[in-house]
Amino acid sequence: HDYIQAAIERGAVAIIGEYTIDLDIPYIQLKDAKKALGYLAAAYHNFPSRYLTVIGITGTNGKTTTTHLMHSVLNAATKGKAGFISTIGADFGEKNVDTGLHVTTPTAPEIQSYLATMLEAGLTHVVLEMTSHGLDQGRLAGVDIDVALVTNVTHEHLDFHGSFQAYRDAKGLMFQM
């Protein structure tokens, strides 16, 4: 809600948010605006994950390594038709992109844009590293997962999640996609 006025000044014709506010343009109040953003981004890109085989990988440790190993195997098996999105970059087939993040899952609009680009490039499989923060914050909403893999779950990120149960629940969101 911190940027609503700036969005209106830049030409926004409608706003989606979580709190009751009075605006002169249409306002849709939702329980989880971040999750809605994921589905809106997916719709904007014509739901690219529906046309790809998406392998989601999460865990406390080993996500990035497992993502890259799985990508290598799939890329060989599909003759170059596999890509990946991880915390350190994305592979679009013929092109590698530094996501600039190196710590967590990209935003929902970025993920959907990457998936759409991969689909347009003729890829058929994508390995997607999924952090607990990204899952909890709805950044992966709108991504259809075909295969879900968990490397491990140990006591980490409790500063963000508050408890081990909440951390485990965030990881479990992957199985609802």
Regions found by a protein language model. Give the residues of each.
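Phosphate-binding loop of NTP-binding sites
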Residues: A36-M177
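N-terminal leader/targeting and accessory segments in enzymes
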Residues: H1-Y39
